Amino acid sequence: IYKVGEEGLLTMESLDHTARIKTFSHDAQTTDSAPSMSAYMTGVKMNNEVLSMSSDTIAEAPLKDANGNKGLTGCASSNGQAVPTLLELAKAQGKAVGAVTTTELTHATPAATYSHICHRDAAYDIAVQAIPNGKGFNTALGDGVDVLMGGGANYWTPYDATNNKRGRADGRDLTAELRSQGYASVTTKAELAAVDPAANSRLIGLFTKDYHLDYDLDRQKNAASTQPSLAEMT
């Protein structure tokens, strides 16, 4: 809008045809991003808060860990079934796959591509589903998601009372586990730019200590920002 002005047309407005769709979830008139992205990934309508599970899955609030941080799954094993995602189907065909986002990597939209869980806020247990050969790994991903980039490093690294108060209470360093399996690991735009794709086909990039990456306008205004743009990540 700033570029074209009030009388100008955005690209979407200049298309030949437009349409309206109903995006209700299985249990609500207004969906949230968990079942909506899950519907894109699986073709299945599910309840609000649920990620890539069957329609009968009930959203169960996540639990707190030993440090009082909310983010552990409260899902009963009998509560619904996982349904295949596009990433899993692509991996089964031998293709490379990735989840790249400017949100936390465990946030509902990216998480729906690689995890199955009854509540979007169980971020600590969402993260482990992306770690090949680790406890909690989503084995439907074969040898794992090839490229993972976003924010929220706290869900992937151990708790520290001074430097990582929202870190993992189980002590696991998921980034170290990925590095041990051949993943390159980066935390800044400069480190990402230095990665040689020919030598590193698998990568995890976590560009914030916690929470999402900055909005693009804020990032552009901050000359000291070390975060990549979505364009630079893709």
Predicted regions and their residues:
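Membrane-embedded hairpin module used as a gating/binding unit in multi-pass transport
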Residues: H212-D214
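Long, structured protein-protein interaction/assembly regions in large complexes
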Residues: Q220-N222
